[in-house]
Amino acid sequence: IDKLQMVFDKGLYDPANEPDIAYPYLFSYFKGEEWRTQKTVRQLIDKYYTARPDGIPGNEDCGTMSSWVIFSMMGLYPDCPGNPSYTLTTPVFSKVTLHLDSKYYPDGDITITTDRTSGEQLYIDRMTLGGKPLNAYRISHADLVKGRNLDMKLKK
């Protein structure tokens, strides 16, 4: 944890060096350190991404950088290629609806909601998936599709 945190504290993280882009999500692989993912992802979004023509760091590389920020802003990120799962973080939005193709996903859309009342609510306090408590910060694609509704209660 200390070595990973050092990457951010010493300014060694470079989002334009694409192998680095999963780094903030690695904290969540360690129980009790998930808050670091939530804090760091938000800091990186605020620091490196803007709504200007040059608002994406580095080379877009066929959507890599914009995909990182879109997934991160929605609150989930596929941090391990080839593994159909996501690491969860605090969404920027109060509600996100993912419209799925009914040919492949007949149960309908996925909705991610938060109880955000303030921009200071950076941390996930508790979560439910399909109305049932979710105690992990990683979720399989199959479980997300099956649960359909991911709700996050946030805290400062």
Question: What feature does the model see in each segment?
Answer:
Residues 1-111, 142, 148-149:
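Active-site core of glycosidic bond-cleaving carbohydrate-active enzymes
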Residues 116-156:
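C-terminal beta-sandwich/jelly-roll accessory domains of carbohydrate-active enzymes
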